Structures are given as structure tokens and as C-alpha cells.
A protein has these predicted regions:
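His/Asp/Glu-enriched, well-ordered alpha-helical/loop segment
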Residues: 103, 248, 252, 312-315, ...
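Histidine-rich, glycine-flanked metal-binding segment
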Residues: 35, 40-80
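Alpha-helix-loop-beta-strand connector modules within alpha/beta enzyme cores
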Residues: 147, 151-165, 230-255, 292, ...
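Active-site gating loops and adjacent loop-to-helix segments of metal-dependent hydrolytic enzymes
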Residues: 91-113, 169-188, 222-236, 291-325
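Metal-dependent enolase-superfamily TIM-barrel catalytic cores that perform enediolate-based chemistry
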Residues: 185-269
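Divalent metal-dependent hydrolysis catalytic cores, especially in the metallo-beta-lactamase
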Residues: 116-142, 155-165, 211-224, 252, ...
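Metal-associated gating/positioning segment near the N- to mid-region
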Residues: 77-153, 169-172, 237, 261, ...
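Histidine/acidic-residue-rich catalytic or RNA/ligand-binding cores of hydrolases
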Residues: 94-97, 142, 172-173, 224-226, ...
Length: 433
């Protein structure tokens, strides 16, 4: 690159970083008629949060307003902790034609996919989601974007990255619809493994290149044509190898599991969360509660795929309709039993930026608005291991704040229309300095 071009490029990049830094250095006082306390699940009136730099300095009606502070008064609104989505696919996107989208995603170069991923990340952040867990991304795109956001070179939510999801040959994590003559067979580096030692290697490969969490495919999925939804895709020995190795290195493990047997085997092997869980039995749900295993229900994925089933090939349409019919009953049982629940959408199956629709879907199957909000803040933060940093509005934590119009407990759909979003002290939506 020529010297003049280098200077121009650096001026753009450093200028963008400096702008963000200026936004995050001043003291800002955010006010609203009320604030949601994710510790107690109650509203506090009035809502006041004092932010200095990237951190919350003080919270609550008695918080002092420092002299010279910038004051943002949002009026009849509710302040909340920044939302957390525990299940997204940040490099994928869906529309009314899911299969067209899938093949477009497959044809992109990794560098090109990174640009799309940043665009989707910006839409997610603007929707009020200041932290996401990316559960499966090819070519290390999620790890790369996480690093760019941390460095201030890209804008987006805090990312907890899984890199490649791990599963068996021909399973949901494999590119099973493609003939071997057209697609290079995948290896443990890309997350495809067979046998305990191969699966242990797959875990090590993901961690070697930056995974914060490990994702496995324990059962079949909707968008993989050849695998039945309910059949386990990993043996007990493989599950124990994956989970044991990940835990040894301090990584949690999330299991994609629609089928009950697959989920139960994963729970018995020490899994940290079950994703989707469409066909979970009462017995498995009780076991999850007993062991403290989180359910990340991704109601959005079922809602979106069921409502778009007519546009899918017949094998996928059948599976989409099956999970739609079973998922609601499973959720009602999980809520009644008291299984720990963390908010997750599977965005990428549905469009990024629509994440907050999940709140309404959760309440439709019996969660209270308070419980749904706690699932997307305090509980999701615990599952992701970021609860010392975010998930509640408390002094010392990252200034991740969202405001929605009116009383959110009276109208949960207000979460879909944020008035104000702040991530790590920088204003993303709303009046900027």
C-alpha cells in the first residue's frame, strides 16, 4: 500500500476509534421514569444511571448528578441492562427465502463474510443487544469479529465466540447435503470428529484459535436435510471427551439438541446448556433443573421456521412443522418445573435485529415479563460467564444500558423499539454528545 493510502487509511480508522473513545470518556447521567432491577425483578422509580467512562458509577434514585455531567432524560421510559442473546449465528442471515440465503452464505469468501457479520452485529447492537454468544461460525469469522470489536476497529456487541460447532460426520454440524466430490471433507479443525480422541482434538483446535465456548451438535437439526431430529449424533464416550476437555480448559459447552435422548445423554455427561430442546421430556427437564443445566429455548427459530415452512424443501418443511408443534408444550413444562432459562434466538435463522421478538414469544408460552427480562440479562450473563461484567445495572459494571418506551412490564413488546442503547459507555442509539 502506498504511503499516502496508508496515511489516509490510518486517519479513518484512528478517527473512528477516537470518536468512540470521546463518547465513552465523559460522565453521562441517564434518567427515565423507571428502571428494571434484574437482581430483584422489580421496577425502581425513578430510574437513574450515572456513567463515567465505560463503567457504571452509580445507580438508583439517590445517585448524585456530578457537576458538568451530560444528562439524558428519556422521560416515560424504562431503563434496563443491555440485553444478552445467548444463541446467534453472526455470519448468517435469513429472509423469506432461507435456501437462497444459505447458498449465498456458502459462496462468500471468509473476508467477505466478515463484512456481512459486522453489518449483522451492528443491527443486533442497535436492537439493544450489547452481548451475544455466537454458537457456530465457519472460518473463524466470529473470533475475528470479536477481536475487531475489542480493538475498537468494528462496532458490535460483546461477543462470546464458539468458532466451529463440533459434531459427527453427516450430522447437523457437517455439510451433509453436499457430495464429497464437491466439498472437501471436514476435519476436527472444522469441528467434524468421530471417536473420543478425534472429538477431543476438535475441542483443542477450536480453543487454539480463540474459542471462548464450545458448541456441539448432539442431535439432528431442521436445516440439515438427511438427519432425523431426535437421533443422538454423539456417543456417550464422545460427549464425555468433548465436555471433559472443554471444562479442563475452563470453557463451557452448549449442546444443540432437539431430541430428548440426545439432550439427556448430554446432561448426564455434564453439559452446561441445552439449545432448542424441542422434544425434551419432563424427566429430562427435571434432571436439568437438578444439575443446574440451562435451557436456551430459541423460540424465534421455531416461530420463524414454522411460519416459513412452505418455502423449504419437503424434508426440512416437515421437520420445521414438527418442532413448532412440540416446542410450546416443552416450554410450558420447563417453566412449571423451574429449569434455568437463558434468552437466545438462533438469529441467523431469523433476521438479525429482530432478536427482541423472543420476549413476546417467551411470554406467550407462560413466562412472566419479569422472568423473560431476567433470562435476557442476569441469567444469560451467568451462563456466558460475563456476570461480573454485565447483566445487571450495578456500580462498577460495564455501562451496557438499553431504554424502551413506557412500562416494559405492561408491554413487553416495547423491547422491540429501543429509544436508547449504550454499549461499554458509548451511545449507539439515542442522543450522542
Amino acid at each position: 500500500m502506498k504511503p499516502k493510502r496508508v496515511a489516509w487509511f490510518l486517519s479513518i480508522v484512528l478517527g473512528a476509534v477516537a470518536t468512540t473513545a470521546v463518547a465513552a470518556d465523559a460522565t453521562t447521567v441517564i434518567k427515565a421514569h423507571r428502571m428494571f432491577d434484574a437482581v430483584s425483578g422489580r421496577l425502581v422509580e425513578p430510574g437513574v444511571v450515572v456513567v463515567t467512562g465505560e463503567r457504571i458509577a452509580a445507580v438508583g434514585p439517590g445517585a448524585a448528578v456530578p457537576a458538568g455531567a451530560r444528562v439524558v432524560d428519556l422521560g416515560d421510559a424504562t431503563l434496563l441492562p443491555g440485553f444478552i442473546d445467548a444463541h446467534v449465528h453472526i455470519a448468517d442471515q435469513s429472509s423469506e427465502d432461507a435456501y437462497r440465503d444459505f447458498y449465498q452464505d456458502m459462496l462468500r469468501f471468509p473476508a467477505e463474510a466478515s463484512f456481512y457479520a459486522e453489518h449483522y452485529a451492528q443491527a443486533t447492537l442497535a436492537a439493544g443487544f450489547t452481548t451475544v454468544r455466537v454458537l457456530g461460525s465457519a472460518d473463524w469469522v466470529d473470533v475475528s469479529l470479536r477481536n475487531a470489536i475489542r480493538s475498537g476497529l468494528a462496532q458490535g456487541p460483546r461477543i462470546v465466540a464458539a468458532a466451529h460447532a463440533i459434531g459427527s460426520p453427516g450430522g447437523h454440524c457437517d455439510q451433509s447435503p453436499f457430495p464429497p466430490e464437491r466439498v472437501k471433507p471436514l476435519t476436527p479443525v472444522e469441528g467434524v470428529c468421530s471417536g473420543p480422541e478425534s472429538c477431543r482434538e476438535a475441542v483443542r483446535d477450536q480453543m487454539k484459535w480463540g474459542a471462548d465456548v464450545i458448541k456441539i451438535c448432539a442431535s439432528g437439526g431442521v436445516f440439515s436435510e438427511s438427519d432425523p431430529l431426535k437421533v443422538p449424533q454423539l456417543t456417550t464416550a464422545e460427549l464425555e471427551a468433548i465436555i471433559g476437555e472443554a471444562h479442563r480448559w475452563g470453557r463451557k459447552v452448549a449442546a444443540h439438541a432437539h431430541g430428548d435422548e440426545a439432550a439427556r445423554l448430554a446432561v448426564e455427561a455434564g453439559i452446561d446448556s441445552i439449545e432448542h430442546g424441542s422434544f425434551l421430556s419432563v424427566e429430562t427437564l427435571k434432571l436439568m433443573k437438578q444439575k443446574g443445566v440451562y435451557l436456551v429455548p430459541t423460540c424465534m427459530a421455531g416461530w420463524w421456521s414454522t411460519s416459513h415452512a412452505d418455502s423449504y424443501p419437503p424434508p426440512i418443511a416437515r421437520k420445521a412443522r414438527l418442532i413448532g408443534a412440540a416446542h410450546d408444550e416443552m416450554m410450558r413444562n420447563a417453566i412449571r418445573i423451574g429449569v434455568p432459562i437463558a434468552f437466545g434466538t438462533d438469529s441467523g435463522v431469523s433476521p438479525h435485529g429482530m432478536n427482541a421478538k423472543e420476549f413476546s414469544l417467551l411470554t406467550e408460552v407462560g413466562m412472566s415479563p419479569q422472568a423473560a427480562l431476567i433470562a435476557a440479562t442476569r441469567e444469560a450473563a451467568k451462563l456466558l460467564g460475563v456476570d461480573a461484567e454485565t447483566g445487571t445495572l450495578e456500580a462498577g459494571k460495564s455501562a451496557d444500558i438499553v431504554a424502551v418506551p413506557g412500562n416494559v412490564l405492561e408491554k413487553i413488546s416495547a423491547t422491540e423499539h429501543p429509544l436508547f442503547v449504550m454499549a461499554r459507555g458509548a451511545t449507539v442509539v439515542g442522543a450522542r454528545p
